[in-house]
Amino acid sequence: MEIYTIEDIQTDADKFKKFIEYLNKYKGSSLDNLYKKVREKVPELNKYKEDDLKTCNTDKGKEGKYIEYCIFGNKPNSISAPDCPELNIEIKVTKFKTLKNGSYNAKERLTISNVGSTNNYETFRDLKDNENIENTKFFKKMEKILLIVLNKENNTFLGGVFINYNELESSLKTQIIDDYNDIRNKIDTKSVSQKGQKYLHIHPHGTKKEDGIRAVGFKNPFITEIFAKQMNYEIIKKGRSCYFNIPKKKTNYY
């Protein structure tokens, strides 16, 4: 097995891709087992343990912080740059829920970045001034995303996919652009809401509703669809619902 360093997986695009392929060999693993396998591939990470990070039980993003630290060697920070700056890649962790029929879909939206407050529409200046989404400040947080997906029910690893905006199917990219234009129009009319947006939407963010903070994020159906496509799972759409099944592993009998 080829051994990597933290620098390898954070700065070398080819090794980063191969590292994600390595992670996906352990779909269905507990996080503890995944960390163990990661440390075999990147021995330098043996000194990066969950106990190093102090988080409270109510911290909604604690799994994300643990994963980013134990798998990529990144400590939590408030820096606006992508998590892997050399590769311009943002690391996101989300959870998928199991439906009654045994299928899966995204439990919640994937927040990208705060963009302003409805208490002061001038705070949306970045969006108002940029007709092209690629020129916005938040675009660097969505251009390239490594999405790590966990099972909500048992916290096992469902897989990791790399989302490159520039390589999306034209239909997906067109819808995102349409959504962005809708968001800008609502800002212009001071009527911000997420109504009518399909993949990218503007939504309330933060604990204090009175602050009027809004963020942009990818909606559940987009996250579900992009993950399933990259994992080669069949996508099922019924009305507004989007979900997929994970094929059962074949058992060999001798």
Residue locations for each model-derived region?
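Nucleic-acid endonuclease domains
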Residues: 1-84, 93-254
